Amino acid sequence: MRYNVEKIKEIVRKNPTTEIIYFWGHTPNPKKITKSCLSQWYDVYFEVDGVQYHTTEQYMMASKARLFGDEDTWSEIMNAYSPAVHKKLGRKVKEFDATIWNEKKLDIVVEGNKAKFSQNPDLKDFLLGTGDAILVEASPYDKIWGIGLDREAALNGSVEDWDGENLLGCALMEVRDWLNDKHL
């Protein structure tokens, strides 16, 4: 993985004018693609190994259930439409092992987002259009996938104030690099 929050902080320290795109929220704009498409909860269909998903949250939680052999929860996740329900079900996966999940979760999210963005040209164009900007999930509630701060708090502080890992932002930048390398 090329990105982590410490590398991002170092980039910004060396170049304080680095563009940072803060995103959070999944409500689409009916007229154009916006940064809401970066959300795990953004509703768009994509397929992985013959299975269709409608959010990367669904993909992540279904993959979590499969990783631990919980086919019942996998089925519930696949039959639910709400990403909030997917998240809730993902927390109930049987035989869950935090060590294994922590080793696999980022790769799972990268793979889901590769499918999401490569199979939806308008989303791919949006992600590629972010150029070399640092992508940051500005969720005040999430210190794993986000930075633990909302956009306003992040803008009024510095990267040193970020209290989260920003794994989603890192995953999306990884996907952007992959799309650029593949010229898809």
Where are these regions (language model features)?
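Charged, low-complexity intrinsically disordered segments
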Residues: 1-184
